[in-house]
């Protein structure tokens, strides 16, 4: 015969199990998103990617009805951020704004990759392009790419270029290779500290994204000589292209939203739709354009195909520049 206390314990346990089941079911059926989303960035605060992402994410959070928490994880050419997101739960609450650095260039720059740029991620939406530009310390007596090349050839090994991303590394190495220059490479963890040393005159030049470098150019702390894209930048129409002097030079930095592999399709569809709505707003396009970003987006499938294409593009760039894996 079961005692009363045992019966009560059994009933309580049964009730607890039923309650837990109901809670679990309710949680599973809760509409996405039901809590804040963490958005991981592979670069430090103050970088071009950070500045443009904060504009987009503020509006995205309003549209989704939750907070978007920006988490900057610079280091190892963006690998720290990419690895963190790749290992996160595919529930839509840990996302990443990536660029060509972690997802296009690193596989050909790093010997020990800690993630697969395709298999470990779910493409959500491309968010645009960020042109890079060549900037130099104002004390360097050159006002064009041709004049800078002449100076560097006159004194081989004297001039250096800083880098805070894979795009900057590849741009500098491509410049040296195509122009036949002996330049010292000085790598940094991210662009802001590299920029600080360039302004202080501790390095000679740098390829930097327009949003990060433009304020310093406008303040006369740096001189801008050219943009890295095939076409001139709408924001800096007076700047020539690198290709105008160094034939074959064409490097663009892209941005896009990704999550861990195997994210539910309905969550990806929702995020993609809201991101694209943000980009359709003229005020947002204007804010991003003022920071040097050409904003546009498309379906997840289009972004997935683009990611694979960019691996081919950056493999060619890196091999052409003669850069070996480190």
What residue spans do the PLM features occupy?
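N-terminal secretory signal peptides that target proteins for export/translocation
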Residues: 1-6
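Bacterial N-terminal signal peptides
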Residues: 10-22
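N-terminal (or domain-start) structured segment
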Residues: 28-119, 157-158, 167-168, 180-204, ...
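An extracytoplasmic/periplasmic, membrane-proximal ligand-sensing/linker region
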Residues: 34-36, 178, 218, 265-326
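Extracytoplasmic/secreted proteins, especially bacterial periplasmic and envelope-associated proteins
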Residues: 51, 55, 59, 80, ...
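Hinge/capping helix and adjacent helix->loop/strand transition within the periplasmic-binding protein
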Residues: 87-93, 108-193, 242, 247, ...
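A ligand-binding cleft/hinge motif common to bilobed small-molecule-binding domains
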Residues: 102-112, 169, 173-178, 205-238
């Amino acid at each position: 015969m079961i005692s009363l206390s045992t019966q009560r314990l059994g009933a309580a346990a049964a009730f607890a199990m039923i309650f837990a089941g109901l809670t679990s079911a309710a949680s599973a059926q809760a509409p996405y998103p039901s809590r804040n989303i963490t958005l991981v960035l592979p670069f430090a605060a103050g970088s071009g990617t950070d500045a443009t992402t904060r504009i987009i994410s503020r509006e995205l959070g309003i549209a989704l009805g939750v907070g978007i928490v920006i988490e900057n994880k610079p280091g190892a050419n963006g690998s720290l951020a990419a690895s963190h997101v790749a290992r996160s739960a595919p529930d839509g609450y840990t996302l990443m704004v990536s660029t060509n650095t972690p997802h296009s260039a690193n596989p050909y720059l790093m010997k020990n990759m800690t993630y697969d740029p395709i298999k470990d991620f779910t493409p959500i939406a491309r968010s645009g392009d960020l042109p890079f530009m060549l900037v130099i310390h104002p004390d360097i007596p050159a006002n064009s790419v041709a004049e800078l090349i002449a100076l560097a050839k006159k004194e081989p090994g004297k001039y250096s270029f800083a880098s805070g991303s894979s795009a900057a590394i590849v741009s500098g190495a491509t410049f040296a290779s195509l122009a036949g220059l002996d330049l010292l490479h000085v790598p940094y963890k991210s662009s802001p500290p590299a920029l600080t040393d360039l302004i202080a005159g501790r390095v000679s030049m740098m390829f930097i994204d327009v949003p990060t470098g433009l304020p310093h150019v406008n303040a006369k702390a740096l001189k801008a000589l050219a943009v890295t894209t095939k076409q001139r930048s709408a924001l800096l129409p007076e700047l020539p292209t690198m290709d105008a002097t160094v034939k074959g030079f064409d490097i663009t930095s892209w941005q896009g939203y990704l999550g861990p592999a195997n994210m539910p399709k309905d969550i990806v569809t929702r995020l993609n739709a809201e991101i694209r709505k943000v980009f359709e707003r003229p005020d947002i396009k204007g804010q991003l354009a003022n920071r040097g970003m050409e904003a546009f987006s498309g379906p997840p499938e289009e972004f997935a195909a683009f990611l694979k294409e960019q691996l081919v593009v950056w493999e060619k760039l890196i091999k052409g520049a003669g850069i070996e894996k480190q």
